[in-house]
Regions:
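Short acidic N-proximal helix/loop "leader" segments that mark the beginning
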Residues: 1-6
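A short beta-loop-alpha structural element at the N-terminal edge
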Residues: 10-23
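Acetyl-CoA-dependent GNAT
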Residues: 14-17, 36-95, 106-108, 112, ...
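Hydrophobic pocket/interface hotspot
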Residues: 23, 27, 48
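Conserved acetyl-CoA-binding loop-helix of GNAT-fold acetyltransferases
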Residues: 98-113, 134-139
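Conserved GNAT acetyl-CoA-binding A-motif
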Residues: 113-126, 135
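Short, polar/acidic, helix-capping and beta-turn segments at strand->helix junctions
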Residues: 130
């Protein structure tokens, strides 16, 4: 399926405490599927939110018409001397795939990474079967 341009009403903004339930709903459906993240499929809400909303992570949500349809984290790459390399993780809500949400979050995260002084972006753990993500990251 070809990715469509995001809705003109799509807003990407910093996370708010009130977004927690929406982020958990997205996170839970993504990890339960088990085909995009190297995280335990049975991970509970508390450890999942501790992982995603961890201090040092810059967290954003994609919202359209008052509904959170995606979320991403931006952080220093955790590997060794890679503090000048950014790492991101993205999750899109079920039913919002193929609508440009992931692409919009990717472009936003690249802008944020540049603004923070990162020199490059590294994507860790992109499953080869995640066709949409692989195509996006290859562009």
């Amino acid at each position: 399926m070809e990715s469509k341009e995001p809705s003109p009403n799509l807003e990407i903004r910093p996370v708010r405490p009130s977004d927690r339930a929406a982020i958990w709903a997205i996170f839970e459906s993504v990890i339960r599927a088990g085909d995009t993240y190297a995280l335990p499929r049975d991970m509970g809400e508390a450890p999942a939110m501790a992982y995603w909303l961890k201090s040092g992570h810059e967290v954003h949500v994609a919202e359209t018409q008052g509904r959170v349809v995606g979320t991403y984290i931006l952080r220093e790459n955790p590997a060794g001397g890679g503090a000048d390399i950014a790492n991101c993780g993205y999750m899109t809500a079920q039913g919002s795939e193929g609508r440009g949400v992931g692409r919009a979050m990717c472009m936003h995260s690249m802008e944020r990474a540049r603004a923070r002084g990162f020199r490059a972006m590294q994507y860790n753990f992109v499953a080869s079967t995640n066709d949409r993500a692989v195509r996006l990251w290859q562009q």
